[in-house]
Amino acid sequence: MNIPFPFSFPPAICLLLIPGVFPVSCEGIIGGNEVAPHTRRYMALIKGLKLCAGALIKENWVLTAAHCDLKGNPQVILGAHSTSHKEKLDQVFSIKKAIPYPCFDPQTFEGDLQLLQLEGKATMTKAVGILQLPRTEDDVKPHTKCHVAGWGSTKKDACQMSNALREANVTVIDRKICNDAQHYNFNPVIDLSMICAGGRKGEDDSCEGDSGSPLICDNVFRGVTSFGKCGNPQKPGIYILLTKKHLNWIKKTIAGAI
């Protein structure tokens, strides 16, 4: 199946989606703990050639990362806890339309956001619910406690996918630290549209299979998992901040969709 993409992007300066690589060696939540089944009702499992995750933000819209590979015939599974078998509470959807943020830059990962319009609308149940977008576009201050969920490896040296949804606690790190020579060294630049966050000496982190997962800080949806180095404390997880510009794009795209 070929997923349709809109053709109304601004020219030249805004790059179209091309498959990106999460620069890591394995997939999934590093460390963390398994969550109680169906307690993260907003989580969307995007199952194609590779796994990604996302957040259900309306009955037929999922927000994820632009670099997620949608080749093949991907499905969006809502209400999932296990990746290995179908559950009674699962709701499975094909993707009607994939709309990457028009200024996504696959080299720097700036604007690494993507909206997926589902074929059909989700039914709200005890396993499926909507994650509200933030009401304000405030920055997230250093030392803020956050959490991120996903499906994947529990150890950075073991790349076997986990069967269950797991969650890691991470703490926001000052961008000056993330950009210094001991961390990303401005390659790429961690700018004001990104959040840098890591766990206990790299023991808790997000990873490739978690791309697109929502970052929740103080019970507010603040960012989308973009890239990192899977538990490497020198390369903490980077999340796309839901800025005013990003939120306006999300709302206008959903309002203007057919």
Swiss-Prot record:
GO terms for cellular component: extracellular space. Disulfide bonds join C52-C68, C146-C217, C178-C196, C207-C230. Keywords: Cytolysis, Disulfide bond, Glycoprotein, Hydrolase, Protease, Secreted, Serine protease, Signal, Zymogen. GO terms for molecular function: serine-type endopeptidase activity. It comes from the Eukaryota. Glycans are attached at N169. The active site is at H67 (charge relay system), D112 (charge relay system), S211 (charge relay system). Residues 1-26 form the signal peptide. It is found in: Secreted; Cytoplasmic granule. Its EC number is 3.4.21.78. GO terms for biological process: cytotoxic T cell pyroptotic cell death; granzyme-mediated programmed cell death signaling pathway; killing of cells of another organism; negative regulation of DNA binding; negative regulation of endodeoxyribonuclease activity; negative regulation of oxidoreductase activity; positive regulation of apoptotic process; protein maturation. Gene3D superfamilies: Trypsin-like serine proteases. Residues 29-255 form the Peptidase S1 domain. PANTHER family: GRANZYME A, KALLIKREIN-RELATED. Abundant protease in the cytosolic granules of cytotoxic T-cells and NK-cells which activates caspase-independent pyroptosis when delivered into the target cell through the immunological synapse. It cleaves after Lys or Arg. Cleaves APEX1 after 'Lys-31' and destroys its oxidative repair activity. Cleaves the nucleosome assembly protein SET after 'Lys-189', which disrupts its nucleosome assembly activity and allows the SET complex to translocate into the nucleus to nick and degrade the DNA. Homodimer; disulfide-linked. Interacts with APEX1. This is Granzyme A.
